């Protein structure tokens, strides 16, 4: 599986790598991103089974933050999972849709203490205006980390390296836009 590599005409030395992946919803109603996985995974497995399947397929599992999705019972399940997980090959995901006023989620602090890296990403909502947000919140890696025959393999190896340095970029969502988008989401669901 190779990534799609994009170059900007105005900055040809800068590359953007897009890799295969998809979202799965567990039995506990927790979202898991399966990065570097093209093969579909079934929804409805337990969190443990889902993460194990992603790893078996050579992927990287990411538990993405979402508004209200890490509170209550689901938050407790994720917390327990973070505390008891096998080290390596698990990430949490932040997203640019988190509003400016929202404090850093407690599970991100726990992740740091347990050696789990937080990967930022834009995660735009399904509205035309959100298309402009794609790639506006994310991370970069050290300059030479993606050189080699396979950018996908290099990216995956860099992310799994115990010495990985994630350099986040972008801003959290403006409060007014956050509330507007949440209102719009509830109207369409």
Predicted segment positions?
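An N-terminally biased module of ancient metal coordination in phosphate/nucleic-acid-related enzymes
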Residues: 1-19, 24-26, 48, 186-189
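Well-ordered, non-membrane alpha-helical segments in soluble/globular domains
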Residues: 1-6, 43-50, 77-78, 107
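Charged catalytic cores and adjacent phosphate/nucleic-acid-binding surfaces used
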Residues: 25-39, 52-57, 68-189
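Short charge-dense sequence patches
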Residues: 1-6, 55-62, 102
């Amino acid at each position: 599986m190779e990534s799609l590599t994009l170059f900007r005409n105005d900055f040809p030395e800068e590359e953007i790598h897009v890799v295969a992946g998809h979202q799965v919803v567990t039995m506990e109603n927790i979202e898991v991103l399966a990065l570097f996985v093209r093969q579909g995974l079934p929804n409805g497995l337990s969190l443990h089974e889902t993460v194990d399947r992603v790893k078996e397929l050579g992927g990287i599992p990411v538990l993405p933050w979402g508004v209200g999705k890490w509170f209550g019972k689901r938050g407790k399940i994720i917390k327990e999972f973070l505390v008891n997980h096998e080290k390596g090959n698990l990430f949490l995901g932040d997203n640019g849709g988190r509003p400016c006023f929202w404090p850093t989620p407690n599970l991100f602090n726990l992740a740091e203490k347990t050696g789990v890296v937080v990967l930022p990403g834009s995660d735009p909502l399904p509205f035309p205006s959100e298309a402009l947000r794609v790639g506006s919140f994310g991370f970069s890696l050290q300059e030479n980390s993606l050189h080699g025959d396979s950018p996908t393999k290099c990216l995956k190896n860099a992310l799994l390296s115990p010495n990985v340095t994630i350099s986040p970029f972008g801003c959290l969502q403006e409060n007014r836009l956050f509330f507007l988008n949440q209102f719009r989401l509830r109207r369409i669901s």
